[in-house]
Amino acid sequence: NIEVKAGEIVGIAGVEGNGQLELVEVITGLATPDQGQLLINGVNLTKASILERRKYMAFVPQDRALMGSCLNASIKENLIMTHYKLNPEFTRHGHILNDKKSTEFAYEIREKFDIQLHSIEDEMKSLSGGNQQKVILGRELLLSAPFILLDQPTRGLDVGSIEYVHQQIIRMSKENRAILLLSSDLEELFRITDRILVLHRGQIVANLITNETNINEVGYLMLEGAAHGA
């Protein structure tokens, strides 16, 4: 079982290929679990559609180019993804996109997340990797969902962008969001999480308080699936 409380940042540590992809797919609705339930704020989302889950869940995927964005679409279009399906203010007569609302919202995210761009009408691929990640983060975090799933959110980013992402994650936890962070960077997990769950061969083999463990212990658990000497 994985439980993440409101205001808590829980990290998932594990050697890649030990069930991380399957975990993300089950949580987001891309795969059906063999057993168990997915509950967010007491709402059973186990059989809910992907769109229904998005009312309760923000998701920053590992592959920002293929899953997190559409590089050939405009920055504005990327910023309103999901929002226009969940918020009726983004459409008129149920189908026509409200361009005024979409533009205002895009500029709001640009300001809040300090996205460096020339025009919101430019293609997403015109942005640096760090600014692309800011677009995805801004879009997802403004969903106001109680649960945030982050899959390798800083992979491939420069030091400044990594620090910015960490600040946003911590800010969201202070807003009482429950955050689950998958990362192959143990230093990242030790820097910002409250607890670390170790994933080994598809099973959670340890549930550790971050400031009561160390990188060596977590690393050993990742490799062996049990504590040293157990």
Which sequence ranges carry the predicted segments?
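Conserved P-loop NTPase catalytic core
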Residues: 24-127, 206-210, 214-226
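Walker B catalytic motif
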Residues: 152-153
